[in-house]
Regions:
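C-terminal catalytic/substrate-binding lobe primarily of soluble NAD(P)-dependent oxidoreductases
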Residues: 1-169
Length: 169
């Protein structure tokens, strides 16, 4: 999704990678469910009924909206940029961390929903107030990023910069 449009709309990009991390416990549980077929989307017969294991599993899992009060820890969303500026090799890490419990206190939801909703609201606000307005259809990276980045700071998702971050392959 995001990486496809970024590669098209930002000149000079040679490589984009997207990744997420999960706890060992989460991955172990997911692997166990996968091993017993519960993540399958292929229909199976159960009690004379055809069911899809993943859909059945969904009925047993807690409603995601109920997870907010007990979700703990922080999110970390960031971009690492590697390239040349004025002929010199540069590395820059721009990131935000967001605390699940603080988000729940503020809006009754955990940080994953918060970090999804706030940027969408900011984008809509910039379109509505005319900051991001021109004829046609555009992706956000095709607009001036400064108003968006400033608004992230104002609306609860402050970002930080780390110059010369340590990179992990």
């Amino acid at each position: 999704e995001e990486i496809e449009s970024l590669a098209v709309n930002i000149s000079g990009i040679k490589r984009i990678r997207f990744f997420m991390t999960f706890s060992e416990s989460y991955l172990t549980h997911l692997k166990c469910l996968e091993d017993v077929g519960m993540t399958s989307i292929e229909p199976v017969m159960y009690g004379g009924q055809e069911i899809i294991p993943l859909q059945f599993l969904k009925t047993l899992l807690p409603d995601p909206a109920s997870l907010g009060p007990r979700t703990k820890g922080k999110t970390n969303i960031g971009c690492i940029f590697v390239g040349k500026k004025n002929g010199k090799e540069k590395k820059l890490y721009i990131y935000n961390t967001c605390d699940h419990q603080e988000c729940y206190k503020e809006v009754g939801s955990q940080a994953v929903a918060y970090t999804t909703g706030v940027p969408a609201m900011i984008g809509a606000m910039l379109v509505m107030n005319g900051t991001w307005r021109r004829p046609g259809v555009f992706n956000v990276e095709e607009f001036d990023p400064d108003p968006f980045m400033d608004a992230l700071n104002r609306f609860g998702l402050p970002w930080k910069e780390s110059h010369d971050p340590v990179l992990v392959d």
